[in-house]
Amino acid sequence: MAQRKILITSALPYANGPTHLGHLLEYIQTDIWSRFQKLQGHEAYYVCADDAHGTPIMLNAQKQGITPEEAVEKVSIERQRDFADFNIKFDNYHSTHSQENKELSELIYNRLNDAGHIKRHTISQLFDPEKGIFLPDRFVTGTCPTCKSENQNGDNCDSCGATYSPTDLINPRSVMSGAEPILKDSEHYFFDLPAFEGMLKEWLHSGTIQQEMANKLDEWFTDGLQQWDISRDAPYFGFEIPNAPGKYFYVWLDAPIGYMASFKNLCDKKGIDFDAFWAADSDAELYHFIGKDIIYFHSLFWPAMLEGANFRKPTNVFAHGFVTVNGEKMSKSKGTFIKARTYLDNLNPEYLRYYYAAKLSGGIVDLDLNLEDFAQRVNSDLVGKVVNIASRCAGFITKKFDGKLSATVMQPQLLKEFQAAAPSITAHYENREFSRAIREIMALADKANQFIDAAAPWVLIKDETKQQEAHEVCSLGLNLFRVLITYLKPVLPEMADNVEAFLNDDLAWDGVQNALVSHPINKFKPLMQRVEMDKVNKMVEESKESLESKVTIDPNSPLAKEPICDEIEFDDFAKVDLRVAKIAKAEHVEGADKLLKLTLDLGGETRQVFAGIKSAYAPEDIEGKLTVMVANLKPRKMRFGMSEGMVLAAGPGGKEIYILNPDDGSEPGMRVM
């Protein structure tokens, strides 16, 4: 088989928050494919980087009182540790905020500009007059122009699903300051995407992406492609556009160039020929693994940019679906929005690698992580089937046969059946049909266990006349196990490493065609523990605690101005006796600027209360009304007399004070519960 040159990427994770199990699907999928290609002997490289630019990162850094670079580094350290602990092995992990990315972004931009593919237009944008910044879509909220729902984002409505421009919002507000944005003109730079329409139509239907995605992207051509805004105004964290002071590359322009930059960084360190992989006439293969939500960036904008800048286009763009948990969208309140680190604190990372592989196909379907099925499948397949083969054979080899396998292979036809599965399993991995590969491997594991069950070496070993047969049964069992683990090596690299140490053998893909005979092995050690549901449940509970739902609060709202107090115990709250009271009489208090003297009827007794509501109410406006009072508050002696309770009211003060009024049907003396 000829050696191929292969460059593999996953989408660059945005450096603005922790990794969760939904993110990990893509990196596990890509890592499995990368490991498989390397096992085939190909020159394959898997690169990635932090997506480090944009307004959200800039603002997040400001909140923390650190620089954007420091904010990115903080997230990157945590993320790379998570990736490493999930056995995701990059050949290089870099950052889009790098010298390589700056140089390549400028190179591509200059080539596009020189070729006439960069246009300039003046546009009107919402601008925060208090913060002095143009507002991205998600930094504006207001009332939906379609359904009139309040507190909706600047680009789409969560209530009715409508999409719109931020300028279409009713009563828009800046998320940053609460101020009403103003419209302000600015010159922006645009990439002339329509100039590449013919090329894109042909490229999309040349087998470069899944057919269902190609059909979906055809919708972009129905109304005609639009020029793409590739600039943002200062202040902005990113790279300044050449010869355009105060203008910066939009994050989605330099983010995919980050693939090139990370590989360039690797090339410079390892002496690899960069142009052999990226030149327009390159015969290397380039594969992008991405989520289905960013397909249009990678299959419209990105190939057009590469074409216009005289670089090669991707060989394939592989899109995958989203992760659900227990059949539902990941939920913080239910504890199913699980961070990578929370998982790692409780469970073996290879459990998840296997479960994802067992459900992944080459299509674009969402993957459900059903936690009960997850435990059952790992326990049944890996512990009950695969590891069980070795655990039932290894001990006899060590104790009875000096730790050496037999000199001959009994039932060579059975071993050949396992070896003959290599081309089929190879094809499944190549086509990203991991679930099919797993099904075929597990079917072989069933056959291995059936062989051992029928041969019963634990019975043979007790018969002195059948020692050789017992030796050969256990030796064949371990040879079958060796083939299975080799097939699983891209999925379970840590287990494969441990098996290599146990068998004293390098598990090479073409090595399955040979048998281990008269071969010494080491003492068997447990390779995998069963998944315990109490640990799964503990992980879910910890996710509820560590990822408790946070509500986005309008900075101009009462809740933002006066946050909720610390929690109290229910017993403390139960001590407060709230009662409905009728304001029988209200009077001005001589010498008091803020107080009214209220006589409250509790339906059997009266109380005198001094309330600081004079700025909002005249006495005659509230006499006869029902309100709510704290009836068991210890009387307090004031300069104007004794106050025997407290009336409940809301508001920031001044004219904005609002007495609480119980609903119709309430009577004086009733307890409020």
UniProtKB/Swiss-Prot annotation:
Domain tRNA-binding residues, every copy: 572-673
Motif 'HIGH' region mapped to chain: 13-23
Keywords, alphabetical: Aminoacyl-tRNA synthetase, ATP-binding, Cytoplasm, Ligase, Metal-binding, Nucleotide-binding, Protein biosynthesis, RNA-binding, tRNA-binding, Zinc
Gene3D superfamilies, sorted: HUPs (3.40.50.620), Isoleucyl-tRNA Synthetase, Domain 1 (1.10.730.10), Methionyl-tRNA synthetase, Zn-domain (2.20.28.20), Nucleic acid-binding proteins (2.40.50.140)
Record-given protein name: Methionine--tRNA ligase
A biological process from GO: methionyl-tRNA aminoacylation
Residues that hold Zn(2+) according to the record: C144, C147, C157, C160
Main location: cytoplasm
TM region(s), chain numbering: none
Oligomeric form and interacting partners: Homodimer.
Name of the coding gene: metG
Keyword Ion transport: no
Family of this protein: Belongs to the class-I aminoacyl-tRNA synthetase family. MetG type 1 subfamily.
